[in-house]
Structures are given as structure tokens and as C-alpha cells.
């Protein structure tokens, strides 16, 4: 079974995202911030990470930079999520290593489409 690490400082948002991924037959792991997410990745690298951009302790972009430097090219797919629809912010996230960019609130159909694009779920 594929795994998804859901990283968001909002417990409610993590639960919604976990439900979406569970419905897509993913096992889910949760982290409240980037620092917790790095620990989770060191323990077991997930297949995909759903990453909030704005969190305390370590932002999503800082997490991406740390993850990419630690994994040296052998890294999971990262879906970067935020409420910002700002081209500069999107560019910074992509440059830091995000594979896809999704605006909140989460949408199951969009997440499934993004996963299908990268071969992590069967397209319907």
C-alpha cells in the first residue's frame, strides 16, 4: 500500500486530507509542521507528501529545501498546498522542490488528477 505524509498545522485540515488519501487507498501519516515531517521521512519515506506552505517552526518551503538536500534526488512526490495564488510564491515552492501546486481547500478530484499525472493513482 502506498503512503502519504500529510503535513499541516491544522488538525482539521489534516483529517480531511487523510480521509481523501484513505479513499484513494493510501496509508496516511500525519505531521503538524515541517520539523515533524522531516523526522517522519527519516523514519520511513512516503510515496507522496501533501505539504502545507505556512506552518510554525518550519515553513513548507524550508521543509522542501531540507528534504531535497537530505534525499539527494531520491525523494517522494510533493504536492505543495496553500491558500496563496501568488505566482512568485508558486515559483519559489517549485524551485525548492515541489512537484505540484494545489490551492486550498483540498479537492479530492484535483488531488486524484495530480496523483494520476505522476503515476501514483490509476486515472478513472
Predicted segments, located by residue:
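Acidic catalytic/metal-coordinating carboxylates
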Residues: 32-36, 59-65
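C-terminal output helix
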Residues: 106-115
